[in-house]
From Swiss-Prot:
Protein name from the UniProt record: Tryptophan-rich protein TspO
GO CC, alphabetical: membrane; plasma membrane
Job description of the protein: Binds tetrapyrroles and promotes the photooxidative degradation of protoporphyrin IX. May play a role in the transmembrane transport of tetrapyrroles and similar compounds.
Membrane topology value: Multi-pass membrane protein
Family matches, as PANTHER family: PERIPHERAL-TYPE BENZODIAZEPINE RECEPTOR (PTHR10057), TRANSLOCATOR PROTEIN (PTHR10057:SF0)
Length: 153
């Protein structure tokens, strides 16, 4: 086990999440506080710990893919980094631009990218199963995003 690669992988993914949270934090207390939300909206305090755990798991998968040479499969590399980019972009669209419709389009693409990432990494390793909690969370977030769009359109 290469501890340096593991730490670098986890920190890289956490850094992307932290960068996205910059757009989120500014809007949670202002714009998002006034948005009509569905009954199944979790409390705001839950999002930080949930995302931290998920980014940690994503970082472990990044490490496993990197350490075991899965990057030689261009599909793994493309879908993995696409889903990270879409994840970051969602915070900008939904919170930064305060645009639930743009966020919805992005998160649907994110759902697809994560599913493909799981499938492509699974061909190499069952470590892709570490992404299942992430997929579950973003599918829930997709439903939440859709409901917020409908309630505020």
């Amino acid at each position: 086990m290469n501890i340096l690669k593991l730490v670098a992988s986890i920190l890289a993914v956490l850094a992307i999440g932290f960068a996205g949270s910059f757009f989120t934090a500014q809007s949670v207390q202002t714009w998002y506080a006034g948005v009509e939300k569905p009954f199944f909206t979790p409390p705001n305090w839950l999002f930080g710990p949930a995302w931290t755990l998920l980014y940690f798991l994503i970082g472990i998968v990044l490490y496993i893919a990197w350490e075991n040479g899965f990057w030689n499969d261009s599909r793994v590399k493309a879908t993995f980094f696409t889903q990270l980019g879409l994840n970051f972009l969602w915070s900008i669209l939904f919170f930064g631009l305060q645009n639930p419709l743009a966020g919805l389009v992005d998160i649907i693409a994110l759902d697809i990218a994560v599913i493909l990432t799981i499938v492509y990494i699974y061909h190499h390793s069952k470590a892709s199963l570490l992404l299942l909690p992430y997929l579950g969370w973003i599918l829930f977030a997709s439903a939440l995003n859709f409901a917020i769009y409908l309630l505020n359109a």
